Design a protein with these regions (language model features):
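Intrinsically disordered, low-complexity terminal regions
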Residues: 1-300
């Protein structure tokens, strides 16, 4: 107990006095517990769960609150899920582990999982990982790295360096500022914000990117999908060196792109598989690619 107090951790054990919540629903047994951490400044938070969603929300104050919702077919199975929590200064690690061999319960089709619901100061460094489950984050500024083996990622009202990765699932980013790197093996991508660096890829899915009015490129952008359409909306005054290509589809361009290819005067569009040229004053490269699908470039 003394060591826990030294690092500022309050762990709630599963006893009536500790306030641990135990319940039962159609998804089996549920046990909820909390862990609290006090920090001076921006925390460096590492979250890991083997299976389960992760939800993070930025709040005022200097505390990190991690609520852990453990589920399983029986109370014994839930109790075997181990929560490891440590703190060293601003560095906080919380990991939920399942036993090496899970219990088999005949007649109950419920596997074990552990969902994390986290309140964190608005300025933070975060690494959140789940083997299977969605991740949501809202209202946080800093380096934010979110990874899931199978599940969607939703991001809103964030600022900083964003790294998003899912093996199978959609990615949605709303009202973001900073640098963005994202990848999904299979899923659609929808992004809106004021981003200076953009690197997006999906193996199979459409991409929609809406750049805010103040958007300016600080480095080359890469936007690609193996199979799906790409739609990009750019503000007035935006400048880039465009390199767009589709393996099977057409490019519909409504921007003023300076090229050596004459404009189709009848339609006011350029319908082709490759389009290269300057947008505005040119500058950093904007590379847009799809293996199979159309590309649409429009003013916002």
């Amino acid at each position: 107990m003394r060591s826990a107090l030294r690092v500022g951790i309050v762990a709630l054990a599963c006893t009536p006095l500790a306030g641990c919540v135990v319940g039962v629903d159609s998804q089996g047994q549920i046990v909820r517990e909390e862990k609290r951490f006090s920090v001076d400044g921006a925390p460096d938070l590492r979250l890991t769960t083997f299976d389960g969603a992760i939800e993070l929300r930025g709040t005022d104050g200097g505390q990190v609150l991690v609520e852990i919702e453990k589920r399983g077919p029986t109370r014994e199975a839930v109790d075997e899920l181990k929560v490891e929590a440590t703190q060293e200064g601003r560095r906080i690690d919380v990991e939920v582990k399942r036993p090496a061999r899970e219990r088999m319960v005949f007649g109950i089709n419920v596997s074990t999982s552990a969902k994390l619901i986290v309140s964190v100061p608005r300025h933070a460094t975060i690494l959140a990982r789940t083997g299977d489950g969605g991740i949501r984050i809202e209202g946080v500024e800093g380096r934010l790295e979110l990874r899931t083996g199978d599940g969607s990622i939703h991001v809103s009202d964030v600022k900083g360096e964003l790294v998003l990765n899912t093996g199978d699932g959609s990615i949605n980013v709303d009202r973001a500022e900073g640098r963005l790197t994202l990848e999904t093996g299979d899923g659609g991508v929808n992004v809106e914000g004021n981003l200076t660096v953009v690197r997006m890829h999906t193996g199979d899915g459409s991409i929609v990117y809406r750049a805010d009015s103040a958007t300016r490129m600080e480095d080359d952008w890469e936007i690609s999908t193996g199979d799906g359409s790409v739609s990009i909306y750019l503000p007035a005054g935006f400048s880039a060196e465009l390199d767009a290509h589709t393996g099977d589809g057409r490019i519909r361009n409504e921007l003023d792109v300076a090229t050596n290819i004459e404009r189709d005067r009848d339609s006011g569009e350029r319908d082709r598989r490759t389009l290269r040229g300057k947008i505005g004053e040119g500058g950093k490269r904007l590379r847009v690619q799809t293996g199979d699908g159309g590309i649409t470039l429009r003013a916002r």
